[in-house]
Amino acid sequence: MNILHTSDWHLGRTLYGRRRQEEFAAFLDWLLGCISTYNIDVLIVAGDIFDTSTPGTAAQELYYRFLARVGSTGCRHVVIIGGNHDSPSFLDAPAGLLRALDVHVVGQACTEPVDQVLLLHDDLGEPQLLVCAVPYLRDRDIRQAQAGESISDKEQKLLEGIRAHYAAVGMAAETVNAGLAQPVPVIGTGHIFAAGGQTVDGDGVRDLYVGSLAHVHAGVFPACFDYVALGHLHVPQKVGGQDHIRYSGSPLPMGFGEARQQKSMCLVQFAVDAEGAFVPQIELLDIPVFQRLERISGSLPDICLRLRALCEEGERVWLEVLYTGTEVVSDLRERLDELVAGSTLEILRIRNQRIQQQALEQELPEETLDDLNELEVFERCLQAHQVPESQHDELLHSYRQVLDSLHGRDAMAEDAGGQA
């Protein structure tokens, strides 16, 4: 049995206003070929299928076109869970129809833990694999707010809720497995931030919950999970040094900070040891680059030298340029655009640190929204309105709660008498 673990497609994502439809299409075409080549039986996509809870028609077309074609590769089952960027109701809406294609979608946490336990069968109808399809767990799914509770109380209850949810789903899987003639491997999924997880600058990874204590440790996953397929972090990595708990990472670089990162997916097979336990054998499958990204920094001569070298290579490259020279170059954009004119290079972003430093010295900050995240914008507002520093922590925490509420809201859900 061959299982392929991927995540964080972020279909519909742009890069500084540049659409990436061709990249996504190329990846999905390559993925179909990969599924055929490696005779994949089960494909697991661990959340953030889309980049937004209201995906555009082009992103939807890519998604459904892929699902319509994947059956022809010989892949018997596709398991998709919702991530924090996804709309649970949007993913779940066609779940009944997709089930007829052996595509199993769990967009949000279920009331009954057993409803998240998928028993997958082989071509002969024999049980082959159990998947505990745990999606991104929203605050409202696992914690009841109480008046007067402190920040640390909220964070602790959140962690307890995550642990309790996984424990309940794990117990349900063990019950199902115990009822089979022969036990089968158990895979758990999740879209979560593991403690110690590695991120990179500009990857767009959002905080999932208010506060940092909700970074879970490997011990949150039940011992019955023979492999844990995680999503949310874009860097391929193990969790807590445990080989069987992994982030596959995103298939495309989500920002220039990931430009030099080798993207991959996890090919998982199971062996049985002397004690009868299922042991995952994991191979990383490298993903090719569909659109080269390059980050260039240095003085103006250094930048120009590198740009000329890239022009000579003739490869299509998207660029981020960081000017760090000491000389003030007010027409940097014009000079660089002239240098790459008519070439295969496209400069998507230029950061002129010398101009920014000069502006700071003149007390005229030249920051743009591209340079700041949501929290930093709020911090600038506090400073601009001369809010006393003694009030900053409480206001920042309240603002984080507002952001968490907005990001966690399902924009595609309909309000029908309180039902979504």
Predicted regions and their residues:
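N-terminal active-site segment of His-dependent metallophosphoesterases
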Residues: 1-68, 75, 401, 409, ...
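Active-site neighborhood of phospho(di)ester-bond hydrolases with catalytic His/Asp-centered motifs
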Residues: 6-7, 43-47, 77-84, 104-109, ...
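Divalent metal-coordination and catalytic microenvironments
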Residues: 8, 28, 48, 63, ...
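Active-site neighborhood of divalent metal-dependent phosphoester/pyrophosphate hydrolases
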Residues: 10, 40-58, 75-89, 194-205, ...
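Metal-dependent catalytic neighborhoods of phosphoester/phosphodiester hydrolases
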Residues: 15-16, 49-67, 82-101, 106-107, ...
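Accessory, non-catalytic peripheral segments of nucleic-acid enzymes
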Residues: 37, 270-420
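Conserved catalytic scaffold of divalent metal-dependent phosphoesterases
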Residues: 96-97, 101-210
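Conserved beta-sheet core of the metallophosphoesterase superfamily
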Residues: 194-269
